[in-house]
């Protein structure tokens, strides 16, 4: 079969890591030909994939034009389908404003559209709610086949989008974590005698990183002897930190996938204050790197981490601070989280299993499409 891997809409966030990981596995499916449409953010993969005889890459950033949103047509992508006699399209993550007229599997990772009971909804205004309704419509009209990374989300999506088929393919850490020779040691953190909490993430509103300001305030007042810093992978200008608390924070900007393992090596705790997720690769990444996890006491987090994390009440800065302090000072407890994490990893699809499942789903829906024709 001829299959388009559509990553033309990916600019930042966890989708970049998933697309990178999936594309690196395509060489194993020699019975299929892949046309991989890379956004400029993923353009570096052209060199990585050039040795694979069954993979062709093109770099293209799909424009978010009114015409494309309304009609679902994109001349460049439609021409790719026609010229390469494509059987099916796998959009790594939507929403896909392009609506191909062939079998189409679309990844769904917009928890905001389904987890309506999240504390996040107390933080957003009318503008955000309208945006979510547009996303909801774009997803619903873009495909008849979806996959999510969490069975709980799959169930919610199936109920919400009646008449569609929803598959579950869990996320994992990128294969570069198992290839130490490819780790980039470019992000060396300043020396620090204390506990380093790492959060690898784009500064999305639902990640709730502002809680760290209140965590720092609490720790500076209640536990002044406890030395801790928070390493964040976005720019300082994205989050206003009071001058008297700046020593708690280390902003290092965006990082490449290959730079992440070394950051984990330099850290003591993975802290993730997110209020909603379908999945976040930072959980399995921390498990793989042997780091204890501190995260929110919410259903999706429990479903992904089980006994491998220390949980705190989602919007309670004091609880977050106490959880960090407990993990940092109770070495036996921290080690138990790490050991539980190694066991929890076995429950996820590995990067190879994820690729196998996605290609198998494409084979199924493309075959079904041929039969219907």
Name what the model sees in each region.
Residues 77, 81, 262-267:
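Short alpha-helical donor nucleotide-sugar binding micro-motif in glycosyltransferases
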Residues 275:
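Aromatic "clamp/platform" in nucleotide-sugar-dependent glycosyltransferases that forms part
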Residues 238-261:
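Nucleotide-activated donor-binding/catalytic signature segment of Leloir-type glycosyltransferases, i.e.
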Residues 310-317, 326-331:
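Conserved acidic donor-binding segment of nucleotide-sugar-dependent glycosyltransferases
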Residues 332-363:
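A charged, aromatic-enriched C-terminal amphipathic alpha-helix characteristic of glycosyltransferases
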Residues 125-146:
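Membrane-proximal helix-turn-helix segments that form the acceptor-binding/catalytic region
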Residues 292-295:
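Short hydrophobic beta-strand element within catalytic cores of glycosyltransferases
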Residues 4, 189-207, 213-216:
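Conserved donor-binding/catalytic core segment of Leloir-type glycosyltransferases
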